[in-house]
Amino acid sequence: YLNNFRYLYIRHDREACTCHANSCIMSAYFSNSHVQYENYINDCKPQCILNELHSWVECESGECCEQCRSECDIAESCTNGQPLHNFGYCYNGNCPIMYHQCYLYCYNSLGNQFPCVPYYTPR
């Protein structure tokens, strides 16, 4: 729960305040984080915060936004190393699936056992 402050771009007032220093989190919020949060909402207009959830939209781990695309769309439910239907693994809230990356950057090597390797190896 406390990590959500970081995902909402709310900065701590002091460098010493981290998610592990529980006593710092609320003091940072009350001093100026609410202004940063308001700026974030107004400037970035994050869909998952502003959009109303539909009752029929559901992710593997619960409700998500209208345009939910994958398991990693909800960063706090994505644990590093979590398998993604045998296509890849969650990493820092993202779903780096090698097949999709190789399709974009070196589509001619998709049939190889190690996609992208021939494309990036010195010849």
From Swiss-Prot:
Domain Peptidase M12B: 6-52
Keywords, comma-separated and alphabetical: Calcium, Disulfide bond, Hemorrhagic toxin, Hemostasis impairing toxin, Hydrolase, Metal-binding, Metalloprotease, Platelet aggregation inhibiting toxin, Protease, Secreted, Toxin, Zinc
EC number: 3.4.24.-
Cleaved signal peptide residues: none
Cofactor note: Binds 1 zinc ion per subunit.
Motif D/ECD-tripeptide mapped to chain: 71-73
Residues bound to Ca(2+): 48, 51
Quaternary structure annotation from Swiss-Prot or TrEMBL: Monomer.
Protein name: Zinc metalloproteinase-disintegrin-like jerdohagin
Organism annotation: Protobothrops jerdonii
Organism taxonomic ancestry: Eukaryota, Metazoa, Chordata, Craniata, Vertebrata
